[in-house]
Swiss-Prot record:
The keyword Transmembrane helix does not apply. SMART domains: HAT (SM00386), RRM (SM00360). Functions as a recycling factor of the spliceosome, a machinery that forms on each precursor-messenger RNA (pre-mRNA) and catalyzes the removal of introns. Chaperones the re-annealing of U4 and U6 snRNAs (small nuclear RNAs) released from previous rounds of splicing, an initial step in reforming the U4/U6-U5 tri-snRNP (small nuclear ribonucleoprotein) that can reassemble into another spliceosome complex; this step involves binding U6 and facilitating the unwinding of the U6 internal stem loop, followed by base-pairing of U6 to U4. It holds the Pfam family RRM_occluded. Residues 1-21, 556-580, 953-1006 are annotated as: Disordered. Residues 590-667, 666-743, 757-832, 874-946 form the RRM domain. This is U4/U6 snRNA-associated-splicing factor prp24. It comes from Schizosaccharomyces pombe (strain 972 / ATCC 24843). The lineage of its organism: Eukaryota, Fungi, Dikarya, Ascomycota, Taphrinomycotina. One of its GO terms (molecular function) is snRNA binding. SUPFAM superfamilies: RNA-binding domain, RBD, TPR-like. Keywords: mRNA processing, mRNA splicing, Nucleus, Repeat, RNA-binding. PANTHER family: OS02G0815200 PROTEIN, RRM DOMAIN-CONTAINING PROTEIN.
Amino acid sequence: MSQIQDLKDENVEMDIDPQEQNEKKPLLLDELTKFTILHPYNYDSHIKLIEELKRLDKKKELSEARKTFQSIFPLSEDLWVDYLLDECKNCRTLDDYVRIKTLFDLAVQDYLSIKIWCMYLEFTLNLMDTSSFEQEQSELNGVITLTDAHSLFERAYQTCKFHFSKSQCVWTLYLEFLQTFGDALFEGEEEQEIVFKNKIYDFHIDRLKLPHEQIEETFTSLSTFVTNNWSPSEYEDVMVKSNKVYETTLKRNAKIFNKELLLNSANHSLEAYMDLINDESRRSTAELQYITTLYERAIVLYPLIPELWLQYTAWLSKVDFSSSQASSVAERATRNCSWIGRIWSIKLTYMTLSGASTSAVCEEKDRCLNSNLLVNFDEVIDFFSGFLKACLYLSSNEDKPQEFLKHQIHKVEDYLRKNHKGSKDARMRIELSKIYLYSEISDFESVEKCWSDMFHDFQNQALYWISRYISTMKYNPELAAETLKKSLYKNVDQPQLLFQFYQSIMDLNNDCFTNTSHLYDVLNAQRISFKRQLDSFAEETKQTVENTEPLKVPQADDTAALSKKRKPGQEGDVFKKSKPIEQHRNREELTVLVTNLPSDISENELKIFFKDCGNIIRIFILEDNQKDVKVAQIEFSETSEVLAAKTRDLKSIRGHEISVQIHVDTNLYVTNFPPTYDELDITKLFSAYGNVVDVRFPSLRYNTNRRFCYVQMRKPDEAHNALQLHKKLLEEKYPIQVFISDPLRRTPRSGAVYEGRELYVTNIDFKVNEKDVETFFRDYGQVESVRIPKRFNQHKGFGYVVMTTNQDAENALSAAGKQLGNRVLNVVLSKPRESLEKTRVSSNDNRTLAKSFETTESNKMSTPKKSFEQIKSKSLGVTNVDGTVNEARLRSLFESYGKLYRVVLHPEHEGAVVEFLDIHDAGKASLALEGHEIGGRLLHITTVNEMMHNVPSSMNHSDYNTSATRPRRLGSRTFQGFNSNHSNINSKKDDLDDKEMQIDAPKSNDDFRKMFLK
């Protein structure tokens, strides 16, 4: 089957094998040529064709293919450079020069490319140097006049001079041109030498007036020029005047330089460009050409971003730019983003304003539609909406403007009926444009017909009724008021917006008595609307309950079975109280955002305002971008309370009309950041993308290895903006992961352990390394990774092997019992670590100090055995440790006072054990870190004994075994891991005498310090 038959879709990617045999190449070239003819708007096919022609060195066909490509699509900077370099090599005749000059003119129109401008200027300088011409280039002698060259250099400089970082190379080429051809350029003028000297001086001064990165080089060049061309007596006066210009520009230059540094640090991201553009646009002394250059610089990097082109073309309409210049930008916008209807409509608008004829505008409209570039219905609507508005201006050129407008409306309706039958525009753009045109020609009967036709589809939209009122007020105020009154009782999407609009209209147009009578309608409609919302919520709740699997009711046989006498030990199974289901806070759906609040609003005032809505869990009051107002985030406990809070939308607080919206998509789930990061580090990281409201770390009580947090941003757009951090490398080893938090999208845990691909291998020979283990297990399948934990450069005798598939892992289980090195391996599948919640011990099974310091057998074999007193003397007990503080943060804090042996968290005691290698380091740390704040708490340094006795104030005792327990007798040795029967004590612990095994009575801080400082 031929390749061309597989390329039916316009958007298909043409993956063509470059290693195809030579005899098939002509066939491939023919198919590419045919395909580009059949599908001229397929970008990739043009690229493939050009690459193939270039490989085959078909220069003539290559030039034609590039010409066709450029006529349809704007070429990128790299494509233009490649194109122009090839063409410049073959500049031999006058026709070649005309063709290449035309290409350069087209290239500099597409994008503001300093590289292409420099190529253009160097090409011109080379042609003016006839001494380097070959014999066959004789036609090129004098092809460029001095005046034409001067005009070109001036155009290049004026176009590029506001490019802060790269415009200097254009200026330098221009200066070289003036210095080389200045004598001939100013020949014949009186006092030619003085004119030339002043021209070069003014050229430097003009450059110094503009901020640019190489401003010091420019000033140095000026100083050298003045030294060489002015007498010593004149030098000082000239340089004093020049220095004033230089010093004035330096102040502006420093500000822009700092902004350019931020741009570089952001890797020239689109967001950084837009921030810089918006910042410059707000300045009262804004330089319009500098802002234009910023837009052009952004477009070079992001030519296919529609929002960038839309903002650029819209900005041109607000500033003092000619319609022809704006029309040129719009033309380029359609070439880059030809699938965006709004951009096409803006182009037609600028064509109309620049004086284009009706036929020219209509031809451009038809060209857009016939090319099938607007495939999305929404884009077609945007296009026609703008076109109909432009028709109002075009009708002024017609003999019968009303008939022209109606004809264009009917053509649009016919097109939509034929190509998009059944599609509806929820934003009513075409309908509103039609109503606007009918109103302008005073055809109010057609206006009413439009509103009536829209009623069926849009009667539930508040925007429909508000727009209808505004439109009808122009020709029938009484009908408008009556229509708006009826809309109050409609079940619309934004009832509060409609109520507030109605009240505002009544306040503007009626006296106090009439206003009072209308108040009844508003209050009654609000009551009905609120009842609708509650009924809707109740129905949704009912459906949720019905879809939930019902609880199983015990049958008669089951009841009888329960009534029988049970065996001892079965009571717990039958009568154990069921643990209540833990209710998770769904902050994403239970928080509302309140904006436009008074700047001095208080939390108590907000509680009073929303008290009737429900139970408020917490309130955050934040600064807004506008300094005179604030915003607040209010979290409720139930969905119905959020709906009730929504009824406060558009209400007033001390003269401020507030907005209340459900606050979704503001919480971010963040993981895989450096273990030492705390709330301040996370806040600093995310503050670059918006205002951070809150950072919440999880409790480590049941899993000390958790490393994630939730970051709440002020607004949804700020949260989405922060997604740019996703996969950014922190500290050169941690690719952070950032997601919009969505509890409804929680997925089951995944990974090697959960997929049954990880093996737990024990009894590994201490002389064996990870490479040996990997080689050993390759006999059973493909090995993904091997990890053998180490301490002090010696592994512990166990490790983890991850296979590529679970089948390979099953095969590798047969390695159990086989010898590696001098030991026989034990191999089992790794199991997910159960949370401490499931393995929690009873409250009477108190952990002991000896148990806290118990080491594994592998540790005993790899490190010298230490006495219990030695371990205890170098260990600190740390209490009041917040449940969100992990081991890495504690280690980072304590290791600044000396080398650590280990850090062990004890979340059940809100504490930790920190063991140093040196007793003096432990003493220094105990004195220095007493009362140190971490995680919002002040640490208390004590003994390990006291820490292990610590009962957190926040502990819920009902979570533990609630059976009655006897107070422990002083001197008793019955504790976790040991029995009163001495024969059951592990023989390996015989070296610990009874005194060492006993938990000491709690010591005071003074006793503890004396132990270290004696």
